[in-house]
Amino acid sequence: MEVSNMTTVTVFILLGLSNNPQVQALLFVLFLVIYLLTLLGNLLMVLVISTDSHLCTPMYFFLRQLSFLDAFYSSIIVPKLLENLLSKGETISFLECFTQISLVIFSGATEACLLSVMAYDRFQAMCHPLLYVVIINRRVCAGLVGASWAIGMGTGLINTLLLAQQHFCGPNVIHSFACELPPVLLLTCSDPCASIVSILTTMSVLGLGTLVLLLGSYSCIIMTALRINSATGRSKIFSTCSSHFLVVTIFYTSGVLRYMIPASGSALEQVLSVQYSVITPLLNPLIYSLKSQEVKVALRRMLARKSRLPL
């Protein structure tokens, strides 16, 4: 059959997580609570960092960007999931699906870059403390964040444009609760070689590159900490970096497991998608707020200021 005679798909069908109405109602409540907590945690982190002068440091500048990105990423996936659970509708338009794919790739690539930037920031702070203020100045911070967002935007745009060149003519059922690149690529009727090469290039260059930068930064930090004779000094270094290291571990572990497993619509794949898309953005602000004494103190200061305001 020639491509010109094929029927073009205009909508996709998302299989979702369950067809049972009772389970759907339970999932709706669960994901709504998680989504609201995700927005609350991340936007509260943005507000605290933006309004507290004690947190005007490069580390918290980068953390504010990460918190905003997590709130944005969660808003790409969860609202459509809630809409489908509530309305029992499972369709998503071609344009809406590809927009979601583009934004998901953009967010993931940007977060990988931001996490590497944050590791580099900690490396400079721990290994070159006397030059830290000179090296990581305001202009450098803005440039690193701008480069992270630009790389993410370019990665999302390139992968989505290559996917849009594919022809979708037959099955339109996506074995997932959201439009993601691997399951959508299975539905193409044309040769997906260009998209596959693009995905592999993204994973090897961006994924591996940022991971190498992360591991290199933390290796230097650990070696610096081990050379310190003071147990208090070592403890302070590990305490400062532990939150970021935990966030990095969760992000890369869930991301690698999600995208290295072939798309099949299995229960494991669905669980990994939920963990990567829904749970991870919720965990990040919790990890930083629970493990950072500075954030806790800043939050208490903000609440104290609010309580003193006249009614």
UniProtKB/Swiss-Prot annotation:
Q: Which GO terms describe its molecular function?
A: G protein-coupled receptor activity; odorant binding; olfactory receptor activity
Which ranges of this chain reside in the Extracellular compartment per its record? 1-28, 87-97, 164-195, 258-269
KW Transmembrane (keyword) present: yes
* Gene Ontology cellular component annotations, sorted alphabetically: plasma membrane
Which keywords appear in this protein's UniProt record, sorted alphabetically? Cell membrane, Disulfide bond, G-protein coupled receptor, Membrane, Olfaction, Receptor, Sensory transduction, Transducer, Transmembrane, Transmembrane helix
Q: Does the keyword Aminoacyl-tRNA synthetase apply?
A: no
**What cystine linkages occur within this chain?**
97-179
Specify one Pfam family.
7tm_4
Q: What is its main location?
A: membrane
Q: How does it sit in the membrane?
A: Multi-pass membrane protein
Transmembrane stretches, start-end: 29-49, 66-86, 98-118, 141-163, 196-216, 237-257, 270-290
The listed locations are: Cell membrane
According to its UniProt entry, what is the function of this protein? Odorant receptor.
In the record, the note on similarity to other proteins reads: Belongs to the G-protein coupled receptor 1 family.
Q: What is this protein called?
A: Olfactory receptor 5BS1
- Gene source species: Homo sapiens (Human)
